[in-house]
Amino acid sequence: ELGGDVIHMDDFFLPPALRTQQRRSEPGGNVHYERFLTEVIPNLSSGRPFSYRRFDCSRMIMGEEIPVKNNGYVFVEGAYSCHPLFGDYMDRRVFLDIDGKTQEDRIRKRNGEDRLQDFLQLWIPLEEAYFQAFSVWEKADYIIL
């Protein structure tokens, strides 16, 4: 076990008030990158504990404070963690890929059949457009298939 903290990009889900057509047309625009830039990025190199607020998707409101000890490894996980607006804040970039069938099976199990269609028609195409627009695969130090 490495220890350390995990910061989930899903905690920076874009709130409804910011979901404009213009924003959704930007590659990587469906993550609240402004909040990640102010609540996380400046704190990572400090070595001091900090916290950020988690967006609660089930209630569409800001949720609880998430403490980050920041005294060792900090893992930032999620599709949009490599957004170019964040700069070069990572020591290593690891891209984890998955085949379509396994991805669908996992989404179906986690979110149900009804929500699967949302992922297939909206969220996955947005992620794919972001990966392509910003060459996420090419910039990864490691790719795990």
Positions of predicted regions on the chain:
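Conserved nucleotide-sensing/catalytic segment adjacent to the nucleotide-binding pocket
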Residues: 5-8, 14-67, 73
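Active-site donor-binding loop signature of nucleotide-sugar glycosyltransferases
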Residues: 11, 98, 145
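Small-molecule kinase domains that catalyze NTP-dependent phosphoryl transfer to phosphate-bearing small molecules
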Residues: 61, 83, 112-145
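ATP-dependent NMP and nucleoside kinases share a basic, alpha-helical "lid"
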Residues: 61-110
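Conserved beta-strand scaffold positions in the cores of enzyme catalytic domains, especially
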Residues: 4-6, 93-95, 141-143
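Glycine-rich phosphate-binding P-loop
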Residues: 1
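Short, basic, glycine/proline-bearing loop/turn elements
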Residues: 46-50, 100, 114-119
